[in-house]
């Protein structure tokens, strides 16, 4: 059965522990911040934190959705922390980041679904760190393109929204999110002239043809940056891994994506949407 699949050697994870890792951890904790690195049990946390990079998660740590692949806490979120934008901006300054990546939980409980908090965070980061480029990984805002426009108007350099998986499997693993709604979000980002980026997981039972079809869909929507990584089951409550995709097939996907016309492609077992994000500017 899928949940008993043995993890292959190519998925060995590097643990952190150097001085820079400790400094990153200290900055994050002292400013009472959340990161997707910890909440999502990211396999690259050791490497990234040891390089002094982290992906900040705003809007609190409790998500209003319960996607079957995700390890983030779900339930009724706390009110937004008005100090969070300033704390994120100051942490970026202390870490001396040239490129900052921000994501968020879904806040379907808020009238504007968290869009104004996104805007405040991006603008505060840019005020405090004028030389830092900003990449944001946004939710679908329930398909409300007026809210997507608000984020675009805050002028981040890259806006990412993850498709997560192929069309057929999407309803099984994404809570409330819809494949075509995500495409509409990405299309709006690209239409506004911002670099549009998306990421998917493989190993959920998709076929090669379905992955190639997704590439065509997002390319047609205007996406220029694509990341592909192995789905890893973060806990027993999450959907089990269907398959551990070989490095050779990841390379095949990378070549196919490049041939189709994507400008930047990351495709390897441990790739996540914010992995080596500074290269995507």
UniProtKB/Swiss-Prot annotation:
It catalyses: [[Fe-S] cluster scaffold protein carrying a second [4Fe-4S](2+) cluster] + N(6)-octanoyl-L-lysyl-[protein] + 2 oxidized [2Fe-2S]-[ferredoxin] + 2 S-adenosyl-L-methionine + 4 H(+) = [[Fe-S] cluster scaffold protein] + N(6)-[(R)-dihydrolipoyl]-L-lysyl-[protein] + 4 Fe(3+) + 2 hydrogen sulfide + 2 5'-deoxyadenosine + 2 L-methionine + 2 reduced [2Fe-2S]-[ferredoxin]. It is an enzyme of class 2 (transferase). Pathway: Protein modification; protein lipoylation via endogenous pathway; protein N(6)-(lipoyl)lysine from octanoyl-[acyl-carrier-protein]: step 2/2. Binds 2 [4Fe-4S] clusters per subunit. One cluster is coordinated with 3 cysteines and an exchangeable S-adenosyl-L-methionine. Its EC number is 2.8.1.8. Its main location: cytoplasm. This is Lipoyl synthase. It comes from Parabacteroides distasonis (strain ATCC 8503 / DSM 20701 / CIP 104284 / JCM 5825 / NCTC 11152). The gene is lipA.
